[in-house]
Amino acid sequence: MGLEEQLRLLPDRPGCYLFKDASGRIIYVGKARNLKNRVRQYFQSSRNLTAKVLAMVGQIVEIEHIVTDTETEALVLESNLIKKHKPKYNIRLRDDKHYPYLRLTLTEQWPRLVVARSMKKDGSRYFGPYTSSQAMWETMKLARRLFPLRTCNDPSRYPRGCLQYHIGRCLGPCLPDFDRHREYAEAVRDLQAFLEGRTQEVLERLRARMEQAAERLEFERAAELRDQIRAIEKVTEKQKIIAHTMVDLDVIAYARLYDEAGVQVFFVRQGKLVGRDQFLMSGADEMTGGEILAAFIQQHYSQTDFVPKEILVSEDLPDADVIAEWLSAKRGSRVALRCPKRGEKRALVEMVAQNAQEAMTERRQQRELELAATEGVLRELQAYLDLPRLPHRIECFDVSHVQGAEVVASMVVFEGGRPKKSDYRRFKMKVDQNNDFANMAEAVGRRFRRGLAERAAQVEGRVRDLEEGRVAEGGAEYGGKFADFPDLLIIDGGKGQLSYARAVMRELGVDHIPTFGLAKENELLCTEDRPDWIELPRGSQALFLLQRIRDEAHRFAITYHRKLHRRASTHSRLDDVPGIGPKRKKALLQHFGSLKAIREASVEEVAQVPGITLELAERVKEALGGPMR
């Protein structure tokens, strides 16, 4: 179906649209109040489109759409789809999956504060994400010092109390005669309020409890509460007062650097600045400031439990009313989303914007220093190996096996001296499992055959674009990661592996690529052009870079080999039966207890297992053997 036909079928309804390229990859996800009108705007006139959007439009061959009931639902769906597919042309938070959270386990009998790598719908209260693990651990340490909750995984292991109990940092729910249930519940509530920045509320509650304890002549308990109050006051006294009212708000501003945007968030709780965080967003070139902030708010607040009553931004947002409606639904009460133009709040926004600019300036300076150092190393390597061009892209191959079993190869890629993990590839050997030289030749051959095929597809795609008159600026992109050939190829091994790799490269017509073998034993290099071994100076940055690349290839191959080994060790003959997946396999083994018992059972007995039809039972018996009746 052509694009015009796909456009004609779009509904006049809210929802999300997904643009796909010739390979079926999703390259952009968007939302719309009216799908038909919004998507048609991309194809009606190129006059108002940026170069980046023109390039994207030139690659679209398929349009998929998902209808929603409301625009707010479309906004939530868009955020989830971007997170799942990571489309090339969407602006998105960088590396958000690595940011840790603090998790308050409210569903446990005795809740505790633990570190979590992701947020789940498990009834717990999550705080974060923390872009700095150091800040997260400092918060954890502080929380454990101020609020005496348990830190152990299993309270039943310490019937006499753990060390934290004996030093006064845990109320001791593990004790058989524990009777401080109310105090523990209060500590949980206070910790949650403290982590949400409601410090004044916590202090007021603690002071009230201290007075009540004194009235009941519970002087030891009153003293504990007094010490806790003093500790919290000492922690919070350095927090800067930036609002004269007891307000909770997040203040968000951004600064640009190349195709990135640095978004700074100041967290104000009860009028005090309790923290700030810096986030990086990729794909920000040609995006307006409002679009950057809108994308950040969608992605950031979809990953956090807490939404403040008010959010201040440095620029007006597109679809601000829809975003505010979504935030309000998430919070459970109205959220004000504002771009202040004057007064105290405008000054606050400008302060955050200044901090964002300073952070990105520092990042630019750091990047320039790193680039200068990296270019120096690459020039050093170019000189040592007499390369015709700077080795910006370096690829390295390694073969891994254990006694000839499960032989695998890895290909790692470094660009500009840094790993480019999106281009890493792994190969499971198909030909000669017991020949290291042949294995290396197979891996290198498969890499370049695929690369040549992708380059041919690129040419065909551009010719087709020219014929159809839909060439975007720069031309459409076709093919995959293999189409980029290296400036330098490293083979993990000696002259034998190198010789086999070069033979297959000559056969494919890619032998112009400089190729070297790197021997592990003495860190010497070999190449076809020189009879003697090449020794780079010990301690040189060029040698260190090659060692790092070689070690990364070895690590990547070993990781894949272990994965295959684990899979093989848990594989059973049931896995080879069509129609038997993990759930049915589990049901069969739970019912019969072993493969032997299944083999000895009749077809009718196997068919009695939930989810197993008579036809499936016959397949199972054919695969395992044993009596059919």
From Swiss-Prot:
GO molecular function per UniProt: DNA binding; excinuclease ABC activity
Keywords annotated in UniProt: Cytoplasm, DNA damage, DNA excision, DNA repair, Excision nuclease, SOS response
Superkingdom, taxonomy of origin: Bacteria
Domain GIY-YIG: 12-91
Record-annotated UVR domain positions: 200-235
DNA damage listed as a keyword: yes
Cellular-component GO terms for this entry: cytoplasm; excinuclease repair complex
GO biological process, one term: SOS response
Pfam families on file: GIY-YIG, HHH_5, UVR, UvrC_RNaseH, UvrC_RNaseH_dom
Description of how the protein assembles with itself and partners: Interacts with UvrB in an incision complex.
Family statement drawn from the similarity comment of this UniProt entry: Belongs to the UvrC family.
Function: The UvrABC repair system catalyzes the recognition and processing of DNA lesions. UvrC both incises the 5' and 3' sides of the lesion. The N-terminal half is responsible for the 3' incision and the C-terminal half is responsible for the 5' incision.
Name under which the protein is recorded: UvrABC system protein C
Organism annotation: Symbiobacterium thermophilum (strain DSM 24528 / JCM 14929 / IAM 14863 / T)
